[in-house]
Amino acid sequence: MKQILQDMANGGTTVTEAPVPQCSKGHLLISTTTSLISAGTERMLVGFGKASLIDKARQQPEKVKMVLEKVQTDGLLTTYDAVKSKLAQPLALGYCNVGIVHEVGAGVEDFKVGDRVVSNGPHADMVKVPKNLCAKIPDNVSDESASFAVVASIGLQGIRLAQPTLGESFVVTGAGLIGLLTIQMLRANGCRVLAIDFDQSKLDLAKQFGADICNPGKGEDPVAVGLAFSRGVGVDGVIITASTKVSDPVTQAARMSRKRGRIILVGVTGLELNRADFYEKELSFQVSCSYGPGRYDTEYEDKGNDYPFGFVRWTEQRNFVAVLDMMAAGSLNVEPLITQRFEFEDATKAYDALTEDKSGLGLLLKYNSPVETRLEKRVVLRPISIEPKNAVVGFIG
């Protein structure tokens, strides 16, 4: 089978031969039909990979501290080799996968062979995914639409933390893929929505989905526009889906919010906060974690132990289901978010488009090779140049 891997040393992406994962207890083996390239996360990963070693360090200061500590204990040369080795490890890209269940592991009762499912599997012909990270697709939802379910769940979890009520005014800062999906879900919750972004084409889509818009790139003041949008009382909540190194989105969110307003960070921003902005209004600020409860919990994800329904209503899997239900009901429209479609074998072209077109949103990969071909076992030998002076001699027996 084939899979997309990224070289973290230089940011290059390749479609390469990889071993077919073996289905195991509590897992599904899925034959992929469609996958969505996450414009935000994957563009950030590719950009990080292409950065110099110094720029990589600047982007991850917490890792620099770990490296410096390792230098003190293990020495400079050993640490340098360890860093280079870490960067040389290829990274599997993708987490928005749609496919057909090919095999069901022991202990899985809610899925069967032939089911159409979404999962957070990577960009690959065949993926093995824990059952709690999969959800069945309704018959009237296409594979292309369903591929947006996982990324939409990221926005949905932010909404759940914000707890919007009918008629409230909300701001979505960052009208990228997650932001535009969040806008639609807030509108479905009966909220008035203001979208803030520097990209007018994305704001035009936000307006199409029923939001008011603000473009700071045209000299519009987000705080003033937000206060006017709230009719002078301050907005009830702000969901930040932007990705930026500066703290402006959080600062602006605090200043446009009403007393006891809610601010939810779904994206990535700087966090240099002014205490007075939050103290005087008793604002709530919370960082949202991915798709929802269960994320990064090995008991839930890897071992398949679900949370009690009565205590955790919305797990990450149940968020997947909720998004798919909205699509089935026509409440969530992703068709305008599809920018381009590529054959899986041409994925490198898709990643070129991802880095070249900053306005791009939904890039879809289509998988058309026969399942039998994907399951063929092949051995791929990578050429290695050996210098005689670096030869290693070993003895067996």
Residue ranges with predicted function:
Residues 1-90, 121, 366-378:
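Short N-terminal strand-loop motif that marks the start
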Residues 4, 228, 232, 237, ...:
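C-terminal capping/lid region of NAD(P)-dependent oxidoreductase domains
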Residues 37, 111-112, 164, 257:
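Short, well-ordered loop/turn sites that connect or cap secondary structure elements
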Residues 78-89, 96-120:
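A glycine-/small-residue-rich N-terminal strand-loop-strand element
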Residues 116, 142-220, 224:
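Mid-domain Rossmann-like dinucleotide-binding core that forms the NAD(H)/NADP(H) cofactor-binding site
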Residues 121, 197-198, 289:
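Conserved acidic E/D residue at the C-terminus of a beta-strand in Rossmann-like folds
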Residues 162-164, 204, 209-288:
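Glycine-rich cofactor phosphate-binding loops and adjacent beta1-alpha1 units
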Residues 273-336:
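C-terminal substrate-binding/catalytic core of Rossmann-like NAD(P)-dependent dehydrogenases/reductases
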